[in-house]
C-alpha cells in the first residue's frame, strides 16, 4: 500500500514537472516579448 502511494507521488511530481516546464518557458517568452 505504501509502495503504491510512493509510485503515485512520483508520477504526480513527474506530471507537474512535464506541465510546469512548458508553462515556465511560455511565461518567460511572454515576459520577454512584452519587454
UniProtKB/Swiss-Prot annotation:
Keyword vocabulary terms for this entry: Membrane, Photosynthesis, Photosystem II, Thylakoid, Transmembrane, Transmembrane helix
Compartment annotation: Cellular thylakoid membrane
Its membrane topology: Single-pass membrane protein
Bilayer-crossing regions: 7-27
Single GO cellular component term: plasma membrane-derived thylakoid membrane
Main location: membrane
InterPro entries: PSII_Ycf12_core-subunit
Swiss-Prot/TrEMBL GO biological process terms: photosynthesis
Role played: A core subunit of photosystem II (PSII), probably helps stabilize the reaction center.
Family as reported in the entry's similarity comment: Belongs to the Psb30/Ycf12 family.
HAMAP family listed in its UniProt record: PSII_Psb30_Ycf12 (MF_01329)
Record text on subunit structure and interactions: PSII is composed of 1 copy each of membrane proteins PsbA, PsbB, PsbC, PsbD, PsbE, PsbF, PsbH, PsbI, PsbJ, PsbK, PsbL, PsbM, PsbT, PsbX, PsbY, PsbZ, Psb30/Ycf12, peripheral proteins PsbO, CyanoQ (PsbQ), PsbU, PsbV and a large number of cofactors. It forms dimeric complexes.
Name of the molecule in the record: Photosystem II reaction center protein Psb30
Phylogenetic classification of the source organism: Bacteria, Bacillati, Cyanobacteriota, Cyanophyceae, Synechococcales
Name of encoding gene: psb30
Amino acid at each position: 500500500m505504501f509502495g503504491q502511494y510512493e509510485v503515485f507521488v512520483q508520477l504526480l511530481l513527474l506530471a507537474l514537472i512535464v506541465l510546469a516546464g512548458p508553462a515556465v518557458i511560455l511565461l518567460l517568452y511572454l515576459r520577454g516579448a512584452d519587454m
